[in-house]
Amino acid sequence: MESLQSWGDFDRRPSVSEDPNEHHYVLKSREEVDRLLDFVLQEKEFGGHREAGDYLVAYQVDLACWLSYPETGSPVYHNPGEKNARIAIAIYDRDSLHMVHGLQVWVTVLDEHGNEVGTAQHPFLYRPGRNQYGSDWQLPGDGKYNLRVRIEAPDSLRRWNGQPYSSPVDVEFHSVEICTGHKVS
């Protein structure tokens, strides 16, 4: 697998983070953005993605599994119980492709006939190397579903170039094939 360092000449600019060692890559062309995007999405095994507002939104579906959510001190693990599918949403800055943290993300699942299965807030998932917003779901069974993702505009989060993520974003993924069950650990 090709490493990011071998991808060419990326400009680096300081971020607005309090950490002076944190930098963001400024991609010089759409071709570089597309190459980096292909790497990120292939590496993370996402099923699809869309650009929406200031974000690049991607989804991943899998069997239900133990999930870990960050809480004070250390991650807390949650058993899926009767839930039979995991839906995860990754949200990147559209321009820098950095993961955007601190968002309120809501997902609505609709069956293939357009009937609402449910709506749930997806908290941030702590998964080393695969940080996402996600949750286990109880779905009627295997099949094609539509996913509606709502990302609320944050109160204080700002992009590296000083422009806020200023408005809520809605994005839909259609005919997402979801297999239900539990991962064996």
Describe each model-derived feature in a short phrase:
Residues 83-95:
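Beta-strand-rich structural segments
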Residues 43-45, 72-75, 104, 118-121, ...:
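Short structured motifs
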Residues 160-185:
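Short beta-strand elements
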Residues 93-110, 116-119:
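Short flexible loop/turn segments that cap and initiate beta-strands
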Residues 84-86, 102-106, 144:
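Exposed beta-strand and adjacent loop surfaces of beta-rich binding modules
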Residues 23-24, 64, 146, 170-178:
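Non-globular disordered terminal and juxtamembrane segments underlying protein topogenesis/assembly
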Residues 90, 119-154:
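Short, solvent-exposed, Trp/other aromatic-anchored flexible loops in extracytoplasmic proteins
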Residues 7-86, 184:
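Beta-strand-rich domain onsets/edges
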